[in-house]
Amino acid sequence: MKQIIFDCDSTAGIPGYPMDDALALFYLLGRPQEAEVLAVTCTFGNGTTEQVYRASRDLLSEAGWERLPVICGSSQGEEPVSDAARFIVEETRKKPGELSFVGIGSLTNLYGASLLDPGIFDRLKEIVLMGGYTAPLLYHGSHLDELNFSVNPEAAAWVLNHGKNISILTGNNTLEPSYLPKEEFYTAMGQNEAGRYLAEK
């Protein structure tokens, strides 16, 4: 089973904001035999860090996952060392070689953690990121900018140059999710708490 620190800029629940990060989180929460999410660490991107923190906390509480820690990172333009960065360092010290870092927002929190403790990259089992692109990002005929690395390019460059065991899913891989009709989605997802919550939404 993978033990995961889930680092995101989820804004699900805020009118007019995207919910893709929340879908990724609930995908993991719906597979307790395969993955254990230890905490959600919040960064900026889709919204401010404070918006992401409140939205993530409210979403998890509404869905019955209020016991899952939600930890705030630094805001855009601030020093990258934060509660989220310190949490990442502490958890990797407790479980060296066991934790997966999944980052689907800016890489500010992992960057901040590495500034606190450069040995963190040796203690993480793997780093899985969403960012970059290998072809133009087209959505409904419009060109999209890069989705995550460009939000904090200094942090992204640092992690990509110093991190180890990195896997990257580009925007081209993640832009076009497949959707089932509502009835089929409910049947497929309604077997666990996370799936039922998403199906009902």
Question: Residue ranges of each PLM-predicted region?
Answer:
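N-terminal acidic, glycine/proline-rich low-complexity segments
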Residues: M1-K201
